[in-house]
């Protein structure tokens, strides 16, 4: 058997097709059992995220895996096949290591994918679709992803606006855990900002939004306080950090409002990060002595620098993934040789047992022991040398000197 992986992702298929081949969390358990039942080894792991669906098996039959996917989702071969990428053998291991390390992600080096791959592996184990090869492949992959994170800077630099905003705050304040943060807006970007802040130990967050119910829903998750936009002047003086991202056509925080808040703060510095377009914070706020205003353009230049840094780190990571996939395949080959040795020994022992049993029966019937012993030795020799003799004969007829040399070495004929 050999490793096979097929998949589609954001590079090869539209959102529409990705949705059609995705596996919902409540169905993926049974899907993995179904796919595993179609393989000779009973091994299958399915990774399904918003950006990719990938099927990993140890079947050696790529076409069968594709047929299963099409049948499961009731899709035509013409719709699915052109969007699939396929890997076999070592390429499977290398691809999985690249995916788990964020090297194949929409955002280069993003860490979330590793958690998603781990969840898929756990579900596969629960479904009983993991045996020795898949277990070793995924366990090795997790170690490689950790090695890449440790030995390269692939995940060190911020490459999203939300992450960059929080990274900037970390550079300015020695510890975010003691800061008070005002978030303006309650959309996806601000939610991501809140998550990064929470991960960095921020406990005091206020979320201001035009619709209070939307802010309250978000605050429940992060233990924050929800307020309306009209209440901002009351909470602004307590804020060390203000991060704003709304869809407002007009500025929400003006120079006068911020100036008044700074006076109440006795001119303690305030970091303001405006990641909205159009701006949420008046540009004139930057003129105030104790206000440090950054816009989305400032963050974008940081992101571009960081992306260059990640691309450089990705080159190092690619080398690690390739090296480690080679090592994994050495283990696979050693496993195959162990199986071959076991099969060869079993077959040889079966021949020996059969011939010994015949000899014992003949002895019991009064046969000549010396004659039977010689007959046993001859028959055993002939049986054991039959396969290598045939292989040497075929190689000689074909003029295959390489195979002849390998057979001579294996049979110990070239020993001095």
Swiss-Prot record:
Name the residues annotated as site: Important for activity: 95
SUPFAM superfamilies from the entry? Glutamyl tRNA-reductase catalytic, N-terminal domain, Glutamyl tRNA-reductase dimerization domain, NAD(P)-binding Rossmann-fold domains
- UniProt signal peptide: none
**Active-site residues, Swiss-Prot/TrEMBL:** 50 (nucleophile)
Alphabetically list the UniProt keywords.
Answer: NADP, Oxidoreductase, Porphyrin biosynthesis
Output the Gene Ontology terms for molecular function: glutamyl-tRNA reductase activity; NADP binding
* Residues at which substrate binds: 49-52, 105, 110-112, 116
Pathway membership of this protein? Answer: Porphyrin-containing compound metabolism; protoporphyrin-IX biosynthesis; 5-aminolevulinate from L-glutamyl-tRNA(Glu): step 1/2
InterPro entries from the UniProt entry: 4pyrrol_synth_GluRdtase, 4pyrrol_synth_GluRdtase_dimer, 4pyrrol_synth_GluRdtase_N, GluRdtase_CS, GluRdtase_dimer_dom_sf, GluRdtase_N_sf, NAD(P)-bd_dom_sf, Shikm_DH/Glu-tRNA_Rdtase
Binding, NADP(+): 185-190
**Function, please?**
Catalyzes the NADPH-dependent reduction of glutamyl-tRNA(Glu) to glutamate 1-semialdehyde (GSA).
**Similarity annotation:** Belongs to the glutamyl-tRNA reductase family.
Known partners and oligomeric status: Homodimer.
Record protein name field: Glutamyl-tRNA reductase
According to its UniProt entry, this protein's organism is Shewanella sediminis (strain HAW-EB3)
Biological classification of the source: Bacteria, Pseudomonadati, Pseudomonadota, Gammaproteobacteria, Alteromonadales
């Amino acid at each position: 058997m050999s490793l096979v992986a097929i998949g589609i992702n954001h590079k090869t298929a539209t959102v529409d097709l990705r949705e059609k081949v995705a596996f919902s969390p409540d169905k993926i358990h049974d899907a993995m059992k179904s796919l595993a039942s179609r393989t000779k080894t009973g091994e299958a792991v399915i990774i399904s995220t918003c950006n990719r669906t990938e099927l990993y098996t140890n079947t050696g039959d790529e076409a069968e895996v594709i047929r299963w996917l099409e049948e499961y989702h009731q899709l035509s071969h013409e719709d699915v096949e052109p969007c699939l990428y396929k890997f076999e053998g070592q390429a499977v291991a290398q691809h999985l290591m690249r995916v788990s390390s964020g090297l194949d992600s929409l955002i280069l080096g993003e860490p979330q994918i590793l958690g998603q791959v781990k969840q898929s592996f756990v579900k596969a184990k629960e479904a009983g679709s993991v045996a020795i090869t898949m277990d070793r492949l995924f366990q090795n992959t997790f170690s490689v992803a950790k090695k890449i994170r440790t030995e390269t800077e692939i995940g060190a630099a911020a490459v999203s606006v939300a992450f960059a905003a929080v990274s900037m705050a970390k550079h300015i304040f020695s510890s975010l855990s003691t800061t008070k943060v005002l978030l303006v807006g309650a959309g996806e970007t601000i939610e991501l900002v809140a998550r990064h802040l929470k991960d960095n130990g921020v406990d005091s967050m206020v979320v201001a939004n035009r619709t209070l119910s939307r802010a309250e829903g978000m605050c429940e998750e992060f233990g924050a306080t929800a307020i309306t936009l009209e209440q901002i002047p009351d909470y602004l003086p307590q804020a060390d950090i203000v991060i704003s991202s709304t869809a407002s056509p007009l500025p929400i925080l003006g120079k006068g409002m911020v100036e008044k808040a700074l006076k109440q703060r006795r001119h303690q510095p305030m970091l303001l990060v405006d990641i909205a377009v159009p701006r949420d914070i008046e540009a004139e706020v930057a003129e105030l002595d104790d206000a440090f205003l950054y816009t989305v353009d400032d963050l974008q230049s940081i992101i571009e620098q960081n992306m260059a840094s990640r691309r450089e780190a990705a080159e190092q990571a690619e080398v690690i993934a390739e090296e480690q996939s080679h090592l994994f395949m050495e283990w696979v080959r050693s496993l195959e040789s162990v199986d071959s040795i076991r099969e060869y020994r079993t077959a040889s022992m079966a021949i020996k047992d059969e011939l010994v049993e015949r000899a014992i029966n003949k002895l019991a019937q009064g046969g000549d022991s010396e004659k039977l012993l010689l007959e046993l030795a001859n028959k055993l020799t002939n049986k054991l040398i039959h396969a290598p003799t045939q292989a040497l004969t075929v190689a000689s007829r074909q003029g295959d000197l390489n195979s002849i040399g390998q057979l001579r070495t294996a049979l110990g004929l070239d020993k001095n």
